[in-house]
Amino acid sequence: IFFFVFACLLALSAVSAAPEPRWKVFKKIEKVGRNVRDGIIKAGPAIGVLGQAKALG
């Protein structure tokens, strides 16, 4: 009985440890996406100014 409980514990720990690296990949993708979004938001006013300058010129 003890061996069975130990085997179940071992299996559960292996399953819970397996998805961890995948979550790190998703976090990296999310961080890159956030940086791109922030860059677009910050570049928005500059693009608007360039558009107005072209319209005037």
Curated annotation (Swiss-Prot):
Pfam families: Cecropin (PF00272). Keywords: Antibiotic, Antimicrobial, Immunity, Innate immunity, Secreted, Signal. The keyword Protein transport does not apply. It is found in: Secreted. PROSITE patterns: CECROPIN. InterPro entries: Cecropin. GO terms for cellular component: extracellular region. Its main location: secreted. Residues 1-21 form the signal peptide. Induction: Induced as part of the humoral response to a bacterial invasion. Transcripts appear within the immunized fat body. This is Cecropin-A. The gene is CECA.
